[in-house]
Amino acid sequence: MFELSISRLTFHIFKRNMIKKLFTLFICLLSLAMTFTSCSDEAVDVENVNKQTILVFFPWTGGTSSTGLKDYLESNVDSMCAGIVDKKGLTNARVLVFFTEKYNESTLYDLQYDAASKTVNRVPIKKYEGNSHCTAEGFAALLNDVRQNAEALNYSLIIGVHGCGWTYASDWVNYPYMARPKTGSTEKGNDRNTIVSTTTSDHFSGIQFGNDPNRPVTRFFGSVSLSDNAIDISTLAEGIKLSGLKMQYILFDACYMGNVETAYELKDVTNFLISSSSEVMGEGIPYKTIWSYLCSSAPNYSSAVSGIVNFYKNSDIPYCNMAAIDCRQIDKLASIMKEINSKYTLASTVPLDSIQPLDGFSPNLFYDLSVYVDSLYPSGYLKDQFTSQLKLTIKAAEHTDEAYTALTYPYGSFKVKNYCGLSISDPSQHSVAIKGREKTGWWKATH
């Protein structure tokens, strides 16, 4: 009996102590959990988090002794800064500018608004040598530098360069000089001091520099003088993939980037594509005018497109077309196009000049996508499917009555009666189209 009583007492004491210890442990764990929860809440404070980082990518567009579009690109940065000032700063946003000062020297800048002086400071972050940014691995490294210095919920990319659409630099003869040689005299390459006859020449660059009002400058991606500084769209897409990022939008301030082949190539690395299907004038995008539409956690694509085209409509160089493409819809468009291509081909009786051209090449490289599909005369069912999907794909598209080209001699404009927002090179007889289009993802998905 006595022995049993002692055992029970010991048990009750042990039980009471265990309850105390367990209760103490519970309180400690609860406090620890509350501490971590508190820290986590601070880390995801949606009011203070950086919602958008825009990378402005302005690489080299000239040669070893010519500066290309450098002066225009510097003006574009000034225009962005003016837009930031008008908006009274950057609210939950960052803007980093990659600017190439010389063909082999570049700097990554942080645009920082000074509220006291109402100015924008360009704070250097990192210097780069060479042109590794023109490779997929190099561009991915640049994007990683951007993320490390300005991490955000969303990333966007503005590219200001010369451009030649989906085409591959390696498919050009003297890229992209073999444009439209005609009788007369033109500049050789980008050197205005070297004049050559184009009676039999295949070396007309079509890229004009200078302040002659009768010969406006256009932004004919990368450099057209240095092949090592040219970037294929597939390289750009691969670089973005390697970085692990996906862009909210990519804006091409460059010629001829608004084609369905380019949109298809970029569909997995961006939600939207803002681009022109024709040549973009040297002044480029009026960033100050449309900055509030671009620098936003929810960009206003329709207003951005309208702002760009209206700027040129009211200028003394009224030549512009621009569109905002929802790249998330491109796969569905390709699926319908594949069915159309399986049943219809362009009849030999359809003259190519009856399909709206959007370029100055000879033969033409880029044709309006909608007019091309109309020219295939698909059945009502397929045509309706295509039209409905095209409306979902092209969020906004506007154009002036004419487009300008520096690829003809003499230089001039041509009528644009139809512009859906995307071009296509399927019907082109240009040698570069014949060489390259079957290599594109779009062709493989639709044929």
Task: Identify the meaning behind each predicted range.
Residues W60-T64, E101-E105, N131, V161-T167, ...:
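Solvent-exposed loop/turn segments at secondary-structure junctions
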